[in-house]
Amino acid sequence: MEQQPKMVTGWAARDANGLLSPFSYPLRAKGDEDVVVKILFCGICHSDLSTIKNEWGNAKYPVVPGHEIVGVVAEVGSSVARFAAGDTVGVGYIASTCRACANCRDGFENYCAGLVPSFNAALPDGATVHGGFSELAVVNQRYVVRIPGGGGGASPAPLDRLAPLLCAGVTVYCPMRRLGLDRPGVHLGVAGLGGLGHLAVKFGKAFGVKVTVISTSPWKEAEAVERLGADAFLLSTNAEQMKAAAGTMDGIIDTVSAVHDLTPLITLLRTHGQLVPVGSPGKPVQLALYPLQSDGKSVAGSMIGGMRDTQEMVDFAVEHGVAAEVEVIGMEDVNGAMERLQKGDVRYRFVIDVANTMARAR
């Protein structure tokens, strides 16, 4: 007799109003290389909000979002050697890649043309991929990272604060590493102080670099310097401050997701300095070319990170005490959290306590 698929509960959006509610669906059958993860916590990324509201026109309803997952291994497939039941693990944005292209071979799976996200997607065999707003996830072992510190949830940092590292953390960590903005003596600018920006500050200080936060909000100065440990704060609407800081930064991680002119940030860079936009404005941004050309400056793209880099980032974060500032919510509060996220009313990342609240939210 054919075995019936296990039914699990997640929270899904059914249409572009983005309202999430309980959704029962069959868990994908475990393959030989798969890990079954009991989800403990899942962060909420702005791309989750954009997807459930179909802002990018690619929503495949019903959508179970979530790609900042921390959990415990419940089962492993017969060919899995890297993980065992009880291991604490993380799952980020990647569910599958081609494994054959140059990017995959070089550890840059995040740039594979065949990348399948860990939510709102389908695997090459047609199986639907649901995200982390759910009880369980089945993930190929290649796209799972180990959370150091022991099994069953033991870790040097609370697991809820590690969940956002699986997307937001690796998004800012990778370009800092790749472009040499992780060395003592470097002056790093961080534009924007939200979910991505506050982690860029934390990683920068863990690397031992000088960090200046650049923001349009004067009230964020105390937050940046006193709470997060930034060395300086630059109010981008203050012409005198911007002029005084011109040509002083080796690189800038631009986390701003709203449409904005990049030229003022370019003026802050030293010769051969690099601007890395990691926010995702919905429309084209403005950039004057001459300030780039006149001093050999550049704009560098970056998107999340490959699996090798993601594991390295998690290991570094745990060793150096880098963790997100979070507001933990129950699954039943997720729609209110999405509304607040739309308004920018979060400091700095929402994380759902999936394991302890899913049952009561059904």
From Swiss-Prot:
UniProt pathway: Aromatic compound metabolism; phenylpropanoid biosynthesis
Free-text cofactor note: Binds 2 Zn(2+) ions per subunit.
PROSITE patterns in alphabetical order: ADH_ZINC
Catalytic activity from the UniProt record: (E)-cinnamyl alcohol + NADP(+) = (E)-cinnamaldehyde + NADPH + H(+); (E)-coniferol + NADP(+) = (E)-coniferaldehyde + NADPH + H(+); (E)-sinapyl alcohol + NADP(+) = (E)-sinapaldehyde + NADPH + H(+); (E)-4-coumaroyl alcohol + NADP(+) = (E)-4-coumaraldehyde + NADPH + H(+)
Keywords: Lignin biosynthesis, Metal-binding, NADP, Oxidoreductase, Zinc
GO biological process: lignin biosynthetic process
GO MF term list: cinnamyl-alcohol dehydrogenase activity; coniferyl-alcohol dehydrogenase activity; zinc ion binding
Domain of life: Eukaryota
InterPro entries: ADH-like_C, ADH-like_N, ADH_Zn_CS, CAD-like, GroES-like_sf, NAD(P)-bd_dom_sf, PKS_ER
Binding site for Zn(2+) 1: 45, 67-68, 167
Function: Involved in lignin biosynthesis. Catalyzes the final step specific for the production of lignin monomers. Catalyzes the NADPH-dependent reduction of coniferaldehyde, 5-hydroxyconiferaldehyde, sinapaldehyde, 4-coumaraldehyde and caffeyl aldehyde to their respective alcohols.
Protein name according to UniProt: Probable cinnamyl alcohol dehydrogenase 9
Species for this entry: Oryza sativa subsp. japonica (Rice)
